[in-house]
């Protein structure tokens, strides 16, 4: 069942297409930059490769072959070189497929930002394969489960993760993506490229495009494989482009993790606009500033944890970032304090994107909206249907809090494990968050469905406690959550990292409670105040609650 009638669907599709084309034209997404040959190839490359990494690199290689495509820790690659290398790797993958008698290529990639992940992403589109982007934080047990559940037969992996190999790798062909040691005769990405392609199988004219499979960020058990399609015209791209002044030929620093849906999406947009990806394997705030300065980056694609580290760097205002025109943020929630600090340091250029691995982009707020409404996630983009429902499945009116459900053409097709449940209402898929629309139609996200707790009969969103405590002098960072209570069923607990100075040493549990009491209602006051040295985070910067020390209550 669809939330739209047939007539509404026609109107919705037409309006979404118009919004997409307007944003695409403004960003010169399908431009040819004066190259007649490139103009003639636009539709054929879309027909052959859809909106994939291969298509964007192939089109750019015909349009601006000598423009820098990638600047990473290994050097610089032009679009011509990147396309040539990706096609060589694709042909070598087809040779592996032929030699091993494989029905399909099912390629896993466990690599940090740079060519070690980008070239396999592009090779997937040229060869025709299913690609699994693996979290670099995966344990040996998780990898073992992923390999077996998904029948992965080829693996690109950075050699720093060699100790994560399960005991039984089966018949997986392993290729070292980034190497820090000499691996003898082992197959490496560099060796695949340098070997040439003279006697290798030809690339298919129309590859059989498999799914791009992104893994859930679960910290225990086997991460869920999320099957995502790669359509020809993903209209949701109009939302990505409209929230920031994106255009062709930019230098865009990408610190967002490319194995994550945000980093993967952003890299494809950079290549689609024939721009340059500037990245590094390991994030370092000083290096991030240096890259922006040295390469005169106009854009930064990042996550809050990364630009917070840049803001926390002493004397960060001495770095020249005058070239920056936008900071595109996603991956985890912005807090009001971080928004204020970012705008104060970089100017009103911060855009906020909201979505999930399963559902891609759900909403986006441009810099003007973020500056006025510090935590709004903005408008629903073209091509996306989003509704808010109560616990009984009824749609809630504007201004009221509801569970967020949505769909678009890039939404998951399912999970690699078909037994994994997908919660739907009227054809829309639950994203797992609570939110509301304000009077301007901007979406605000309050918390995860299961984060909200009831204390003494009152609803409490732990995020509101976090946002208040972030402003407390002597608090460096904080996480808030609900824990079980024998009397009130749930109670608020906080884990606080104090600043390493005299102010931080004066922060006590009672001082924390007093600060919350002065700013929020009594039911939001934390009974548990836990002081920790650091907060456990995953590769995208989200706090991992399971890895926090057990909460203790002071009676």
Q: Which positions does each model-derived feature cover?
A:
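Conserved AMP-binding/adenylate-forming
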Residues: 49, 75, 90-138, 459, ...
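AMP-binding/adenylate-forming catalytic core of the ANL superfamily
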Residues: 91, 117, 292, 300, ...
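Conserved AMP-binding A3 loop
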Residues: 78-80, 211-235
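Conserved structural elements of the adenylate-forming
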Residues: 83-88, 226-247, 308
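Conserved ATP/PPi-binding loop(s) of AMP-dependent carboxylate-activating enzymes
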Residues: 379-383, 394-425, 442, 458-460
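Conserved AMP-binding/adenylation subdomain of ANL enzymes
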Residues: 234-251, 259-299, 313
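Conserved pre-ATP/AMP-binding loop-to-beta segment of ANL
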Residues: 65, 193-215, 222, 245-251
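Gly/Ser/Thr-rich phosphate-binding loop
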Residues: 298-299, 315-373, 385
């Amino acid at each position: 069942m669809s939330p739209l009638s047939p007539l509404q669907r026609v109107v919705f599709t037409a309006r979404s297409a118009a919004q997409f084309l307007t944003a695409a034209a403004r960003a010169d997404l399908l431009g040819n930059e004066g190259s007649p040959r490139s103009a003639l190839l636009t539709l054929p490359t879309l027909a052959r490769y859809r909106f994939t990494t291969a298509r964007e690199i192939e089109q750019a290689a015909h349009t601006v072959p000598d423009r820098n495509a990638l600047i990473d820790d290994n050097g610089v690659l032009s679009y011509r070189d990147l396309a040539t290398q990706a096609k060589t790797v694709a042909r070598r993958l087809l040779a592996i497929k032929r030699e091993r008698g494989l029905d399909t290529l099912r390629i896993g990639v466990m690599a940090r930002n740079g060519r070690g992940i980008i070239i396999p992403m592009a090779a997937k589109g040229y060869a025709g394969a299913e690609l699994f982007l693996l979290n670099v934080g995966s344990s040996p047990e998780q990898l073992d489960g992923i390999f077996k559940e998904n029948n992965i037969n080829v693996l690109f992996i950075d050699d720093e993760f060699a100790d994560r190999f399960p005991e039984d790798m089966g018949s997986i062909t392993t290729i070292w993506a980034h190497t820090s040691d000499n691996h003898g005769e082992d197959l490496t990405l560099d060796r695949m490229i340098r070997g040439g392609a003279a006697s290798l199988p030809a690339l298919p004219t129309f590859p059989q495009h498999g799914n791009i499979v992104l893994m859930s960020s679960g910290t225990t058990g086997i991460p869920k494989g999320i099957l995502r399609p790669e359509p020809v015209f993903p209209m949701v791209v109009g939302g990505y482009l409209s929230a920031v002044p994106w255009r062709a030929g930019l230098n865009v620093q990408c610190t967002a993790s490319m194995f994550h849906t945000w980093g993967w999406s952003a890299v494809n947009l950079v290549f689609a606009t024939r721009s340059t990806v500037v990245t590094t394997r390991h994030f370092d705030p000083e290096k991030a500033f240096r890259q922006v300065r040295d390469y005169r980056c106009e854009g930064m694609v990042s996550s809050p944890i990364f630009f917070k580290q840049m803001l926390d760097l002493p004397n960060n205002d001495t770095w020249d970032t005058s070239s920056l025109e936008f900071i595109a943020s996603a991956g985890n929630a912005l807090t009001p304090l971080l928004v204020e600090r970012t705008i104060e340091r970089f100017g009103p250029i911060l855009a906020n994107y909201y979505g999930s691995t399963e559902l891609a982009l759900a909403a986006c707020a441009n810099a003007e909206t973020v500056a006025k409404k510090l935590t709004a996630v903005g408008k629903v983009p073209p091509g996306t249907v989003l509704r808010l429902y109560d616990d009984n499945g009824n749609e809630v009116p504007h201004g009221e809090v509801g569970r967020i459900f949505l769909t678009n053409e890039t939404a998951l097709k399912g999970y690699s494990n078909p037994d994994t449940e997908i919660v739907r209402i009227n054809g829309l898929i639950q994203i797992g968050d609570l939110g509301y629309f304000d009077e301007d139609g901007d979406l605000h996200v309050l918390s995860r469905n299961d984060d909200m707790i009831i204390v003494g009969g009152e609803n409490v969103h732990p995020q509101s406690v976090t946002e208040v405590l972030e402003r407390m002098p002597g608090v460096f960072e904080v996480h808030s959550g609900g824990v079980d209570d024998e009397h009130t069923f749930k109670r608020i607990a906080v884990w606080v990292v104090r600043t390493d100075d005299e102010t931080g040493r004066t922060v006590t549990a009672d001082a924390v409670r007093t600060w919350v009491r002065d700013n929020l209602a009594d039911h939001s006051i934390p009974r548990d105040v836990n002081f920790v040295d650091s907060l456990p985070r995953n590769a995208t910067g989200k706090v991992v609650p399971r890895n926090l020390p057990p909460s203790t209550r002071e009676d």
